[in-house]
Amino acid sequence: MSRRGTAEEKTAKSDPIYRNRLVNMLVNRILKHGKKSLAYQIIYRAVKKIQQKTETNPLSVLRQAIRGVTPDIAVKARRVGGSTHQVPIEIGSTQGKALAIRWLLGASRKRPGRNMAFQLSSELVDAAKGSGDAIRKKEETHRMAEANRAFAHFR
């Protein structure tokens, strides 16, 4: 056993304008090549577009979208006796949020549109309503876990 202490889990910092951790998690996932100011610009433009589209609080739309996309359970490949099984595992809240953000960004990148802010705002609004590619991805993951429920004892 290691003599070193266990690493403390870092809490996500909040962004400067909205003081929201989810916004900061989004910024850190959208970030490419260290261009954080560009990532902030994209997020803030998307939030502004959400405000224009829905005429409600954009942060509540963001929260609702992430809550809707967050999976409760996922499958993990586990090799048992020469064959690989997809074993369903429960997901914690932090990991679930991280997955939800990754899926939302992936779905928004695939969307047709002028720029990333427009694509992201459209995907977030759709996810808050309960439609869109990110929601489909969550449902697909839940279906996979349900189909492989017989292998749950391999954990």
Swiss-Prot record:
Belongs to the universal ribosomal protein uS7 family. It comes from the Eukaryota. One of its GO terms (cellular component) is chloroplast. SUPFAM superfamilies: Ribosomal protein S7. One of the primary rRNA binding proteins, it binds directly to 16S rRNA where it nucleates assembly of the head domain of the 30S subunit. Its main location: plastid. GO terms for biological process: translation. Coiled coil: none annotated. This is Small ribosomal subunit protein uS7c. It comes from Coelogyne cristata. It holds the Pfam family Ribosomal_S7. The gene is rps7. It is found in: Plastid, Chloroplast. Keywords: Chloroplast, Plastid, Ribonucleoprotein, Ribosomal protein, RNA-binding, rRNA-binding. Part of the 30S ribosomal subunit. One of its GO terms (molecular function) is rRNA binding.
